[in-house]
């Protein structure tokens, strides 16, 4: 451990930051399909932020309700976000499988960014 690590460990972390990190961890490992490579990272970051903030994008009411239920239960549900015309006129999907199932085991939960 270097000196900076020791200093950082001594700084108390605000509870809201701990809560945010715990929330983000419930989305598991974030991965993308190879087709997403041309999409600028700024766009991907914005879409991921929307997804983890429960802005599901361009979904029908039924899919929104399913997302809201899975998000509320945190019991391994699926979350889908669809963002029309997100890049080059194309829709981008972000799908979280196993949301909140076991935040300490990222193999059980992951979020994938892809074109439909």
Task: Name the predicted role of every residue range.
Residues 1-4, 115-116:
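Short intrinsically disordered terminal tails
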Residues 5-81:
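Compact soluble domain cores
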Residues 72-116:
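Short, compact, well-ordered microdomains
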């Amino acid at each position: 451990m270097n000196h900076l690590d020791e200093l950082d460990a001594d700084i108390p972390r605000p509870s809201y930051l701990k809560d945010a990190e715990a929330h983000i961890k419930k989305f598991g490992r974030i991965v993308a399909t190879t087709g997403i490579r041309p999409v600028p990272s700024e766009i991907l970051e914005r879409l991921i932020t929307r997804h983890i903030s429960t802005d599901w994008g361009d979904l029908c009411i039924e899919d929104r309700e399913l997302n809201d239920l899975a998000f509320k239960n945190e019991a391994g549900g699926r979350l889908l976000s669809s963002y029309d015309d997100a890049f080059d006129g194309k829709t981008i999907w972000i799908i979280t499988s196993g949301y909140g199932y076991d935040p300490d085991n990222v193999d059980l939960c992951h979020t994938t960014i892809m074109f439909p």
